[in-house]
């Protein structure tokens, strides 16, 4: 009994320390990104509004893990001015401290301006945060389109215990209405999050779609992650998701290649 207690304590401490490491040092890891094909002309009202948006998200992220913005959206203004409006949001993983959230968002802003120069719309997902802006008002509108998925090359066959634990974790994640949730069953762990402007029912629906794609697209993979436009879900078998060295799911090390091969963002 004493040995069992010590093992459980060590497992808890390992999980806690791993999660803490993931919360800060891994938050900058690139997941996916996309740019709209339409480009704006430099030194125009849209560029000014976009720069205001990007400056606002950096300021806000030091105090809040989520916020949305509509810049230049004045219904009383001319049509040319309203077409220069920028709608956007940012979100950090809720387990990040405000200081780490701010660093992640600053990193996202730096990257998105380099990767999507003069784009009317752009989206960037890092391990710890998400940034998106468009000229169309997408805020609060449900979108479950698939943006990115990764399945481990290692799979599990005929392991009833693993699949039961995995399904327990996914069922728990799928039921959340709180925006962010961490779950564990036995040696299987996972977490999920919705964008902060979703209603509880839309969050649950988005996560149900994400979990369904995890099962359908990744099958018996020992670890997998699926990102939809407004939510994501991950799971992994303990010991496979190596927090100390980043993903162990054969992530492409080239930021440019990952970004370039993505399809254009869908426009509203």
Where are these regions (language model features)?
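Extracellular secretory-pathway ectodomains and N-terminal mature segments of eukaryotic proteins
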Residues: 1-268
């Amino acid at each position: 009994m004493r040995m069992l207690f010590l093992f459980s304590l060590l497992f808890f401490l390992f999980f806690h320390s791993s999660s803490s490491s993931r919360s800060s040092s891994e938050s900058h890891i690139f997941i996916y990104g996309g740019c709209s094909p339409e480009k704006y002309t430099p030194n125009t009202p849209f560029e000014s509004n976009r720069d205001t948006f990007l400056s606002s998200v950096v300021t806000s992220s030091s105090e809040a893990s989520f916020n949305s913005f509509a810049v230049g959206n004045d219904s009383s203004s001319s049509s040319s001015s309203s077409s220069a409006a920028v709608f956007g949001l940012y979100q950090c993983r809720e387990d990040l401290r405000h200081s780490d959230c701010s660093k992640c968002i600053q990193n996202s802003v730096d990257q998105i301006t380099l990767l999507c120069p003069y784009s009317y719309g752009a989206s960037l997902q890092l391990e710890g945060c998400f940034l998106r802006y468009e000229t169309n008002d997408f805020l609060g509108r449900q979108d479950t389109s698939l943006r990115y998925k990764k399945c481990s090359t290692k799979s599990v066959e005929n392991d009833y215990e693993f699949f039961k634990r995995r399904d327990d974790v996914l069922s728990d994640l799928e039921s959340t209405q709180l925006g962010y949730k961490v779950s564990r069953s036995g040696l299987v762990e996972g977490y999920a999050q919705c964008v902060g402007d979703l209603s509880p029912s839309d969050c649950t629906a988005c996560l149900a779609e994400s979990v369904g794609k995890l099962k359908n697209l990744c099958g018996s993979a020992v670890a997998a992650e699926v990102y939809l436009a407004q939510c994501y879900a991950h799971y992994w078998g303990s010991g496979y998701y190596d927090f100390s060295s980043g993903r162990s799911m054969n992530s492409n090390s080239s930021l440019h290649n990952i970004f370039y091969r993505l399809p254009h963002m869908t426009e509203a």
